[in-house]
């Protein structure tokens, strides 16, 4: 039964991934092993998918797969979009995850697809440094997505305060990508009447739970809509968007629930 499942999955994977059949077959076994074992421990996975092989032989085969086979991110992304039942438009999210592995800093910048409050990474960069991603790195991931799928299906790009920048906003406007990005409350904007003012000053009269929207403001050289809410614990939360500003706070709250 397991051999049959591996064969079936291998045929599906061969439609999306390049490489010889043996490697694709090993990938199929690893995927089924992950689902069966519920762990990323390679030794445990080997027990679930060893078929007629000895445990040690299967373990070495899986190790060799990860050592010798480099996955193409475009192929991974295409496969993810195939297996996720999303017939409508896509919500993208910028995220960054970092942790320490011994003395090494692991710091990944990710472009993910939102699905049922889960962010599924499709493109990523190992920053190999501490701190945030650069404009070049943000636009690099967006261009990868554009080249593979285009932006026509994108309904929104969500991101936290660290991601917004002059160059990113200009790129999103140029490519007509809908976005909802949180901004810092000390940003300076120019109102439609030409008045320069700090974001926190323009929304300082908000009561807890109250939402306010300002349209056609200029932020970092781009025309944006600002939507703000005052929270009891967190204080002022402001997002910049280029579409449906009345729903921007709700859209961003969805981003905060994504894992």
Name each model-derived stretch.
Residues 60-63, 112-116:
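A short glycine/small-residue-enriched secondary-structure motif
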Residues 81-82:
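Short, compositionally biased leader-like segments
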Residues 89-100:
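Two-metal-ion RNase H-like nuclease active-site motif
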Residues 42-52:
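DNA-recognition alpha helix
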Residues 105-111:
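Short glycine-rich loop/turn motifs
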Residues 28, 42-43, 59:
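Short amphipathic alpha-helical segments
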Residues 55-68:
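Major-groove recognition helix of helix-turn-helix-like DNA-binding domains
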Residues 1-39, 69, 73-78, 87-90, ...:
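Single, function-defining residue in the core of a domain
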